[in-house]
Amino acid sequence: MEKTLETVPLERKKREKEQFRKLFIGGLSFETTEESLRNYYEQWGKLTDCVVMRDPASKRSRGFGFVTFSSMAEVDAAMAARPHSIDGRVVEPKRAVAREESGKPGAHVTVKKLFVGGIKEDTEEHHLRDYFEEYGKIDTIEIITDRQSGKKRGFGFVTFDDHDPVDKIFLQKYHTINGHNAEVRKALSRQEMQEVQSSRSGRGGNFGFGDSRGGGGNFGPGPGSNFRGGSDGYGSGRGFGDGYNGYGGGPGGGNFGGSPGYGGGRGGYGGGGPGYGNQGGGYGGGYDNYGGGNYGSGNYNDFGNYNQQPSNYGPMKSGNFGGSRNMGGPYGGGNYGPGGSGGSGGYGGRSRY
């Protein structure tokens, strides 16, 4: 049936609702089936969908899958019960990232620290705490001010005790704090920025994912001004390869995404691919000596002020965020596996559990 202008928003709304109910499950044993995956996750609620991704030719498991619950509350309950172990193997559940969000800086990086832009002069720490504590336990809140004038510079950081609240906040695009629209992004350390930029230029390896690397200070909002360029696919041509049901892929391309570090896909958003040309620095500098790369000299005084409207973090030298990358069909392309690394698969590499 031909799609009409009326059905497109409805489909998008349905997809967004599904996105909040879907988990990516990485690190699956080759022995794990859809039945055993379903049996495990049904302890937290009713599943509306469950799939183990397989190679279309060999039918061998690629070491990851997806489960979709009937409600967000069930997803929260499952994530609160981590760690998860299926068929004798500890797996890595993460909130699935839709295709349109997958290419954003930090989309697949696991951190505990959140960058918050759009903070106005009348917004205080307690406003941030009141808003964000519903997502999880907060460790620290910092609103950045000018050292000389003491005025707020329009941004700050919220650090949680776990990465899942940050992932959940990142998925929910629109946030209003103290009556003002706010822009939220995962806060990346200089090392993480460099890893992301290295992957974009085709020099990256298979970094895996795991521990949050989010403690302490010294963070920026992620590479790429306007939060547009910069694939987070830790590794040239790697990432998720295929995908699932029309949702964005990991950095290796395809549809539904979870996290980097799963070895080689075929095509898609591979590191350094076209369409991610932004090399500009959003705020002009880093934060507490973590600037690095395109973020300037590295002192947070070079970070600039957040005076623009949300979604306009600074000048771009080039851009073109998004664009299709060999999306293929719902179950097409890519090779994944729970062991090894490199072009034909794998989970592992340097996973940071």
Swiss-Prot record:
Q: Spell out the residue ranges making up region: Nuclear targeting sequence.
A: 308-347
Q: Which residues form the signal peptide?
A: none
- Tissue distribution of the protein: In the brain, isoform A2 and isoform B1 are abundant in large ganglion-type neurons, such as Purkinje cells, and are less abundant in neighboring glia cells. Isoform A2 is more abundant than isoform B1 in brain. In testis, isoform A2 and isoform B1 are present in spermatogonia and spermatocytes, but not in spermatids or sperm. Isoform A2 is more abundant in the adrenal medulla than in the cortical cells. Isoform B1 is found in both adrenal medulla and cortical cells. Isoform A2 is more abundant than isoform B1 in the adrenal gland.
> PTMs?
Asymmetric dimethylation at Arg-266 constitutes the major methylation site. According to a report, methylation affects subcellular location and promotes nuclear localization. According to another report, methylation at Arg-266 does not influence nucleocytoplasmic shuttling.
Write out the annotated subcellular location: Nucleus; Nucleus, Nucleoplasm; Cytoplasm; Cytoplasmic granule
Mind telling me where the Glycyl lysine isopeptide (Lys-Gly) (interchain with G-Cter in SUMO2) cross-link is? Answer: 22, 104, 112, 120, 137, 152, 168, 173, 186
Stretches assigned to the RRM domain: 21-104, 112-191
Which positions bear N-acetylmethionine? Answer: 1
Changing residue 266 to A does what?
A: Decreased methylation. Does not affect subcellular location
Q: Molecular function (GO) terms listed?
A: DNA polymerase binding; G-rich strand telomeric DNA binding; miRNA binding; molecular condensate scaffold activity; mRNA 3'-UTR binding; mRNA CDS binding; N6-methyladenosine-containing RNA reader activity; pre-mRNA intronic binding
Which residues, renumbered to this chain, carry the PTM Asymmetric dimethylarginine? 203, 213, 266
Residues with PTM Phosphotyrosine: 331, 347
Chain positions with N6-acetyllysine modification: 168, 173
Instruction: Kindly list the GO CC terms recorded for this protein.
Output: Cajal body; catalytic step 2 spliceosome; chromatin; chromosome, telomeric region; cytoplasm; extracellular exosome; glutamatergic synapse; neuronal cell body
Q: What are the Gly residues biased-composition ranges?
A: 202-223, 320-353
N6,N6-dimethyllysine modification, residue list: 104
**Which positions does the record annotate as the modified residue Phosphothreonine?**
4, 140, 159, 176
Q: Which UniProt keywords apply?
A: Acetylation, Cytoplasm, Isopeptide bond, Methylation, mRNA processing, mRNA splicing, mRNA transport, Nucleus, Phosphoprotein, Repeat, Ribonucleoprotein, RNA-binding, Secreted, Spliceosome, Transport, Ubl conjugation
Sites bearing Dimethylated arginine, chain numbering: 203, 213
The Omega-N-methylarginine modification is found at 38, 203, 213, 228, 238, 266, 325, 350
Which parts of the sequence are annotated with region: Disordered?
193-353
Report the InterPro entries cross-referenced here. HnRNPA1/A2_C, hnRNPA2B1_RRM1, Nucleotide-bd_a/b_plait_sf, RBD_domain_sf, RRM_dom
The record's domain comment reads: The disordered region, when incubated at high concentration, is able to polymerize into labile, amyloid-like fibers and form cross-beta polymerization structures, probably driving the formation of hydrogels. In contrast to irreversible, pathogenic amyloids, the fibers polymerized from LC regions disassemble upon dilution. A number of evidence suggests that formation of cross-beta structures by LC regions mediate the formation of RNA granules, liquid-like droplets, and hydrogels.
Q: What does this protein do?
A: Heterogeneous nuclear ribonucleoprotein (hnRNP) that associates with nascent pre-mRNAs, packaging them into hnRNP particles. The hnRNP particle arrangement on nascent hnRNA is non-random and sequence-dependent and serves to condense and stabilize the transcripts and minimize tangling and knotting. Packaging plays a role in various processes such as transcription, pre-mRNA processing, RNA nuclear export, subcellular location, mRNA translation and stability of mature mRNAs. Forms hnRNP particles with at least 20 other different hnRNP and heterogeneous nuclear RNA in the nucleus.
Q: Which PANTHER family match?
A: HETEROGENEOUS NUCLEAR RIBONUCLEOPROTEINS A2_B1, HOMOLOGOUS TO DROSOPHILA SQD (SQUID) PROTEIN
Q: What is this protein called?
A: Heterogeneous nuclear ribonucleoproteins A2/B1
Q: What is the lineage of its organism?
A: Eukaryota, Metazoa, Chordata, Craniata, Vertebrata
